């Protein structure tokens, strides 16, 4: 899935989703001076114009491609993002990086090796962070050095991820969660599909498909695959 992106200008962007996060993605696009922004829905009945952006049905995707649109995911849930990608996997998904995000030396070039990531206002990433595809980093979240973040990870507002952490595919970190430091050769790992509850403090690795909550975080229950 990985792709090596250029720094070409995005002129037209269609965002999958019409929920609140889709509008936050649109905010990122506005900060990047993207001139034409529309939202896409899979609902049969919808208003095609609101006060901010035109809304179209996703059946219009092929027409939008012909018009030169690129695409983004305005969907917070990892599984739904992956579902949409599997349905529309041949589109061009640029990375969206808010102008007020902070990236360490060389980090933008690393991000450009991936696709479909959304980095919102106030996010801070240091350096040598390996980023997968279609991840979201919400307001004021931070990512430390030498982290590995796989596809479809969701990082909610004010999450702090220390250095040498690995987030496996589809992990979801709730608002204000903190992930403590791992080791360069033994990273603290949040397993595939695992959910870390809001304001939780994770001090050690967590297996896949678990819900963990608390400070320190403890396993609350398993998640059905």
What are these model-derived regions, one by one?
Residues 2-6:
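N-proximal low-complexity "stem/linker" segments adjacent to membrane-targeting elements
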Residues 10-29:
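Glycine-rich adenosine-cofactor-binding loop
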Residues 32-49:
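NAD(P)-binding Rossmann-fold cofactor-contacting core
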Residues 45-104:
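Phosphate-bearing ligand-interacting subdomains
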Residues 71-74, 119, 213:
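Redox-cofactor binding/interface segments in oxidoreductases and associated redox assembly factors
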Residues 78-87, 91-147, 151, 159-161, ...:
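Left-handed beta-helix
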Residues 150-151, 156-225:
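Glycine-rich hexapeptide-repeat left-handed beta-helix
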